[in-house]
Amino acid sequence: MHFLIAFVEKATKYSLLLFIVLVGCSNLLEEVDLEDLSAEEIYAKAEKSFVSGDNIKAAELFLEIERIYPYSSLAKRALLRNAIALHKEKDYDSSRASAEKFINFYPADKDVPHAHYIIAIGYYDQIDEIGRDQDITYEALKAFRTIIERYPNSDYAKSSALKVELAFDHLAAKQMEIGRYYLQKSHYIAAINRFRIVIEEFPTTSHTPEALHRLVESYLSLGLKKE
């Protein structure tokens, strides 16, 4: 019985060791084989990872195409796909870097508007709440305006125009938040300045009606009924 137990334990250890070795060899072969794959094969693997939701793996594989086959026809497309995968992973800085690299390397390519849009939407997707620093909103506006001005007939220009209005709404919301605070604290002049910004700079936003109402309220509180 003791011999049988010892044999089973020994066999289990050897099986586990063999499994570890095989897994290690498999991973090693995968890494080595990547160099031997064609650009098309690596691209297919990258797309498969992307579709399955493994954005990090997809981004890495797309980047490998540029490294191994920098002059292939797929290198250009892979760079843009890398930017998209990184954006989906919410790695906005790296995504923008890849998109900017694409624009710099292929300035005349038909997908340059798309690359600009990736940059713009990366900023836009970081506007998550009105209490956040609004610098990111201005960066988004700048990027969207670039698309509208340079590629006015593209689908990206239409989407950018809509996003500009939404970004304006974020900025107006921030001004309203500050204006309400000043009004509550009876700092009427400061409140008036904020509400005027909404009315004059963001007149088409959903916050304009309230801004007008608060502006009148602030003037009445100052006793300036004729303003």
Predicted regions, residues:
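Acidic, polar-rich low-complexity tracts and alpha-helical solenoid repeat scaffolds
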Residues: 4, 25-227
